[in-house]
C-alpha cells in the first residue's frame, strides 16, 4: 500500500505528545518493565506506542475509535519508524470489539479516561485483556469540575464557567453558534465524572489500586491547587488530574 504524506497538523500533535511523555512517565515514578507486551487504550496519534517500542517493549498494540488518528499513526509508523513495524500495530476499533482472547502485561492510557463515557464498562474490557498480575497505567485530566474541565469545548470564557451554566444552556448555545445538533455534554466527548466518582469506579472495578496521586505535577499552579484541595469543600474544584496504577489480582492473591 502506498504511503500518504503525513498531515502536518497531526504530525505536530504527535511530536508534542512525544515531548510530553517524559513528564507522563515521571509522574508514575518511571516506566514499567519494558520487556513486556503493552496495550494502549485511546492511543491517538501513536506517540506513546512508539515511545514504548523504542524503549524495548516486545509488543505494542494501540487502539482508538478515531479512524483518522489511526490512519496517521500507521502512516507515521511506516514512514518514520519502519524498524518498529514488527513490534507496533494500530487498530481503529472500540476496545470492546478488539480481540478479547489476547492478554497483555500492561495496559496504558494517557489523557483518555475523562473522555470515556462508560468508564466502568471500559475498565471491565481492560480487565479481560490484562494478564493476572498485570497493571493498568492511567494518567488523565483535567477532570470535569476543574477550572477548565470542559476542555474549552463549551465556549465558557471564565474558569469554571461551564459549572455556572446549565447543560441545557450550554447545549442550546453550542447548537445555535456552531450549527451542530448535540443533545448532551457527553456528545462533546466529556464524561463529567467527579473525583469521588472516579475513586468509586476504581474501587468497584475488581482491580487493586496500587498507586493513586491527585494533581501530579511540578507546576506551581498545581502545587497551589493541592493546598486548596485539602479543604473538603474545595477538593472537587481543584482536582486537576489523576495518575493511577491498577493491578489485576492473581488467582493465588
List the model feature ranges, each with a label.
Residues 50-53, 123-127:
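A structural alpha-helix within SAM-dependent methyltransferase catalytic domains
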Residues 120-125, 135-244:
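S-adenosyl-L-methionine-dependent methyltransferase catalytic module, highlighting the catalytic core
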Residues 111-115:
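Short catalytic micro-motifs in class I SAM-dependent methyltransferases
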Residues 15-19, 117, 192:
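Conserved phosphate-coordination/catalytic loops
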Residues 50, 72, 118-119, 147-149:
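Short glycine-/acidic-enriched loop or helix-start segments at secondary-structure transitions
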Residues 1-102, 106, 110, 219-220, ...:
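Conserved N-terminal segment of class I S-adenosyl-L-methionine
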Amino acid at each position: 500500500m502506498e504511503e500518504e504524506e503525513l498531515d502536518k497538523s497531526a504530525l505536530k500533535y504527535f511530536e508534542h505528545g512525544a515531548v510530553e511523555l517524559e513528564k507522563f512517565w515521571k509522574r508514575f515514578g518511571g516506566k514499567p518493565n519494558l520487556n513486556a507486551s503493552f496495550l494502549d487504550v485511546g492511543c491517538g496519534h501513536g506517540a506513546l506506542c512508539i515511545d514504548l517500542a523504542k524503549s524495548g517493549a516486545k509488543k505494542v498494540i494501540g487502539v482508538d475509535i478515531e479512524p483518522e488518528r489511526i490512519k496517521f499513526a500507521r502512516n507515521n509508523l511506516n514512514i518514520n519508524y519502519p524498524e518498529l513495524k514488527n513490534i507496533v500495530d494500530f487498530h481503529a476499533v472500540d476496545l470492546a470489539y478488539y480481540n478479547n482472547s489476547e492478554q497483555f502485561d500492561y495496559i496504558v492510557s494517557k489523557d483518555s479516561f475523562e473522555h470515556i463515557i462508560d468508564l466502568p464498562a471500559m475498565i471491565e474490557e481492560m480487565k479481560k485483556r490484562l494478564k493476572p498480575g498485570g497493571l493498568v497505567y492511567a494518567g488523565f485530566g483535567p477532570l470535569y469540575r476543574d477550572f477548565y474541565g470542559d476542555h474549552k469545548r463549551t465556549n465558557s470564557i471564565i474558569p469554571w464557567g461551564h459549572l455556572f451554566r446549565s447543560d441545557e444552556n450550554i447545549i442550546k448555545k453550542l447548537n445555535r453558534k456552531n450549527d451542530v445538533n448535540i443533545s448532551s455534554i457527553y456528545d462533546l466527548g466529556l464524561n463529567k465524572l467527579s473525583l469521588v466518582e472516579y475513586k468509586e469506579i476504581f474501587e468497584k472495578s475488581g482491580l487493586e489500586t496500587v498507586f493513586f496521586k491527585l494533581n501530579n505535577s511540578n507546576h506551581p499552579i498545581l502545587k497551589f491547587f493541592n493546598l486548596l484541595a485539602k479543604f473538603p469543600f474545595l477538593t472537587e474544584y481543584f482536582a486537576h488530574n489523576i495518575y493511577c496504577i491498577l493491578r489485576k489480582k492473581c488467582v493465588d492473591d
